[in-house]
Amino acid sequence: STNYNGYAVTKDGKLWSWGMSYTGDGGDSGSLSRGGSNTSPGKVTDGSSEISNVKRWGIDCKRNENVLACATASVLFLLQNGKLYGFGRNISGALGRGNTSTTSYAIEINISSVTPSISSIKGVFGNVSHNQYKESFGIISSENKLYISGDNYYPDGNTSKTSFTFILD
């Protein structure tokens, strides 16, 4: 969960959220963004229709897979077809979209320009700093390479990147 919302994936691969959703982290195009506490779950959408075919958890420790990650106010997840999606506040560009714009619905995260290239994503994870106003996400490729976006300490001396950046093998 983020600071404000909880999430669940149903058996049929639909993603639901509930909670306060002040910063777009409801992923429902704003229908939950009415302030206060939303105790009824809402379907996460892509802006016009509900998201389906979300890869189901069933985290397999031997394969080291994680398919949904949360940070302070953003969410990153994988679909069954291997595509990466995210939504939320996007603090410091943590979603890896190349910008810091908030999005209140799920959008595909383009990783085609990442170098070295990623053939498929094995897992995702989220990180929150001690002050909760900095967040980052990581991708682990099927080749076991680590890529990070958002607030972090990068090998080139930068502390924030808005696109996924290769870190290590």
Predicted regions and their residues:
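Short glycine/serine- and acidic-residue-enriched loop/turn motifs that recur at repeat junctions
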Residues: 18-46, 87-109, 147-169
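Structural signature of WD-repeat beta-propellers
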Residues: 2, 10, 36, 71-72, ...
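Structural signature of eukaryotic scaffold interfaces centered on beta-propeller domains
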Residues: 1, 57-70, 124-131
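Beta-rich catalytic cores
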Residues: 2-3, 71-72, 102, 120, ...
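Conserved core positions of repeat-based scaffolds
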Residues: 4-8, 17, 61, 74-77, ...
